[in-house]
Amino acid sequence: MASIPCTFQLSARASSASAAAAARRSPRAAARLGWLRPSRLSAVVPASESGRVGPTCFFKFGNKDAEGAGIYGSQGRDDFDRDDVEQYFNYMGMLAVEGTYDKMEALLNQDIHPVDILLMLAASEGDKPKLEELLRAGAKYDVKDVDGRTALDRAADDTREFILGFAATLAA
């Protein structure tokens, strides 16, 4: 998973009289906690410049979008593994419905790549954003499970049309 550098600036308005009183009551704590020190960031971009007071976060992606920055949609087939299958199985509530990991383990014990298993699970759930991500990563919708069913067989009609349409868009 990609990490994003982020800087937070918290500013609070206080009168100089109340800050001075706090410093007199506990000068060591005031110095240690930086109560009387202005933020180094506030000299560059004060929070009040935007017209609001509160946290401000600066993300530096340059000229890249989320995909180019490696956050979403930049994974390939081999970037998915068994742990991703288990996490998706749990996240989508399939364990709660099934009651056991048997269905997931049966798929993982076959000679099927984890990204293709994820595509089957996402197709059965109708999870279009996940389907899009997996198809971009190179998942194959014609891989068969132990019952001979593909992701298309598991999908509802609208999801099936989405898979075929999106795959055609990627092929073009």
UniProtKB/Swiss-Prot annotation:
Gene3D superfamilies: Ankyrin repeat-containing domain (1.25.40.20). One of its GO terms (biological process) is intracellular protein transport. InterPro entries: Ankyrin_rpt-contain_sf, LTD-like. The keyword Transport applies. Residues 1-28 form a transit peptide. It is found in: Plastid, Chloroplast. Keywords: ANK repeat, Chloroplast, Plastid, Protein transport, Transit peptide, Transport. The keyword Protein transport applies. ANK repeats lie at residues 114-146. Involved in the import of light-harvesting complex proteins (LHCP) and subsequent routing of these proteins to the chloroplast signal recognition particle (SRP) pathway. This is Protein LHCP TRANSLOCATION DEFECT. It comes from Oryza sativa subsp. indica (Rice). The lineage of its organism: Eukaryota, Viridiplantae, Streptophyta, Embryophyta, Tracheophyta.
